[in-house]
Design a protein with these regions (language model features):
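A metal-dependent, Asp-based hydrolase signature
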Residues: 1-19, 29, 37
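Residue-level recognition of short, well-ordered coil/turn positions
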Residues: 2, 42-43, 97
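Non-catalytic, surface-exposed connector residues within folded enzymatic/regulatory domains
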Residues: 5, 9, 25, 50, ...
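Short, mixed-charge, low-aromatic patches
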Residues: 11-16, 44-52, 90, 110-111
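Short, acidic loop-to-helix structural element flanking the phosphoryl-transfer center
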Residues: 20-47
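Asp-based, Mg2+/Mn2+-dependent phosphohydrolase catalytic module
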Residues: 32, 36, 52-157
Length: 157
């Protein structure tokens, strides 16, 4: 059923208030190191998230020490279809001004990997959770690492 814009705003405020009460999420171990190596390689960093939380996006740009610019983030508000549809990644390619063969996608979720593969981009799986490796590889990931730190340490190799 459709709800009014006023009611949707009310629900969004409640959701945001609850989100802000949660303990601060820690960055993934090695993410700053990986992003610094990516930047040093001359590549652009773009974040594609299924979130539409403004507070989360502001936190992301702040916590990543300026490694991600706000105009280089694709959120749920930028697309009609989220992952596993490739639209979020295609929008990211457009924002970055690159072709699929000029990009890589780093993903930790099966639906995100499926979206990356559908966008025809080399897709790297990082298993950051309890899923078996096969759950990520079976979606078409080109390579798999077991942590962001492992990926960062192997970046130049």
């Amino acid at each position: 059923e459709d709800i009014s814009t006023e009611k949707a705003s009310e629900y969004y405020k409640i959701k945001s208030d609850e989100f802000n009460k949660c303990p601060k999420a820690e960055l993934m171990n090695g993410i700053i190191l990986l992003m610094e190596k990516i930047k040093a390689s001359g590549l652009k960093i773009l974040v594609v998230t299924g979130s539409a939380q403004h507070t989360l996006i502001r936190k992301l740009t702040h916590d990543l020490n300026g490694l991600v610019e706000e105009n280089m983030i694709v959120t749920a508000l930028d697309v009609k279809h989220g992952k596993p549809n490739p639209e979020p990644y295609l929008k990211g390619l457009q924002k970055a001004g690159v072709k699929p063969w000029e990009a890589i996608i780093v993903e930790n979720a099966p639906l995100g990997i499926r979206a990356g593969v559908a966008a025809k981009v080399f897709t790297i799986a990082v298993n950051t959770g309890p899923l078996p490796d096969s759950a990520l590889l079976n979606e078409g990931a080109n390579i798999l690492f077991h942590s962001i730190r492992e990926f960062a340490e192997k970046w130049n190799k």
